[in-house]
Amino acid sequence: GITRFATDGFLMDATDEEFALLRKLSMMENAICLKGQAEFALGIVTGNNAKHLLQRREAGSEPILRGSDIERFRIKGASSYIHFAPGVYQQIAPVALYRAPEKLLYRFVGEKPVFAYDDRQTLTLNSCNIVIPAVEGMDMRYIMAVFNSSVIEFWHRRVNHSMKLLRVHIEGFPIPVAAQEQQREIIRMVE
């Protein structure tokens, strides 16, 4: 049933039609999920944003993204800047995860999943988290397209029942396996 992909909710409020669709999605033969195939990182918790964040870029500072700085498929641009000093923050993931050559950024809180692609090693605050998929033969931008789809929005709303997007939710999203050419076509559509 619905247990093939990770879920943490009950489907008591789903209509028969919705349940049938969720069951069909969960039973897809040619699909994978990210559980065990991705690294996750929380955005930086500075401990004192008023002290550490800048509203304007200055010499030696760099952009840092909030959840509100990303939209589906794109980074709008940073609304804050920071003089990056990893040792002084309340909570920080390994720096290598922020500096990964490519990664997906996602809003931690929102009505629907919002994912953007980053290949500029941009820092993020804790409202903008990181997932780095490592699925052989699957382009990260294709995974972003799937995660921004109305199908995954429906899945998240009906299965996870949460305004927060947790690691366990992302690990359980069904991702259709697609040939390289199909992936490239989908990526072209969303770029």
Residue ranges and their predicted role:
Residues G1-I2:
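A short, charged helix-loop
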Residues L11-E185:
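Polybasic, glycine- and aromatic-enriched phosphate-binding surface used to engage nucleic acids
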